[in-house]
Amino acid sequence: MAHILMKQLLEAGVHFGHQTKRWCPKMKEYIFSERNGIHIIDLQKTLVKLEEAYEFAKEQAKEGKTFLFVGTKKQAQQTIEEEAKRCGAFYVNQRWLGGMLTNFTTIKSRIDYMVKLEELKNNGYFEKLPKKQANRLNRELEKLVKVFDGLRGIEKLPDVLYIVDPKREEIAVKEANKLGIPIIAIVDTNCDPELITYPIPGNDDAIRSIKLITSKIADAILEGKDLREKEADLQLKDEDLQSEIS
């Protein structure tokens, strides 16, 4: 993993958990202490878990797997979009619709419909319609783009989910677990880490904390993709060499 220092975690406030009265007892092993009614997360354990999640994401990307980043809380929306785009992942950062995974066929048809409406609009079709009908289609398109913009081009269920605040995104967690899709997630002190395949103990409310951890997962995906490309290049060179020999 690209070197990350304890100092970076501290500066980003990754160690600040929730109020002690809001904790999940299953997070006990990741809690270092309590200060002024707030749980303090053990950053040594955060580093270990972040390393595990990084290696998993890297290996999955190396195998050509697809990722879906999920984070609809205000503090996460911008980071989720930026980091997903940077590493070529799909993303949901506005609203998780029930069935996005478990009813994927219907969701895919809505995404296709959004793309079709955009094509019609860009080709000037809306301008030929009565104003009332054109306005209705424009409003419908705006709603579709808001929800599905980060899922353009998705053809099948994602292979891995990365989630900011799995307690808030509990429907996404349930759907992924039902389908056996592995989850990487930032788990704050109020979350159940047993629902997550690769939990990363950390502050899921502070923008800097979300940005730091999310960027590391994106880095892992990019590193895995780079390794995949290099292996493909080596294979091509070997095939060329074999054909020359024969």
UniProtKB/Swiss-Prot annotation:
One of its GO terms (cellular component) is cytosolic small ribosomal subunit. Belongs to the universal ribosomal protein uS2 family. It comes from the Bacteria. This is Small ribosomal subunit protein uS2. It comes from Dictyoglomus thermophilum (strain ATCC 35947 / DSM 3960 / H-6-12). Transmembrane segments: none annotated. PROSITE patterns: RIBOSOMAL_S2_1. The keyword Hydrolase does not apply. HAMAP family: Ribosomal_uS2_B (MF_00291_B). GO terms for biological process: translation. The keyword Ribonucleoprotein applies. Keywords: Ribonucleoprotein, Ribosomal protein. GO terms for molecular function: structural constituent of ribosome.
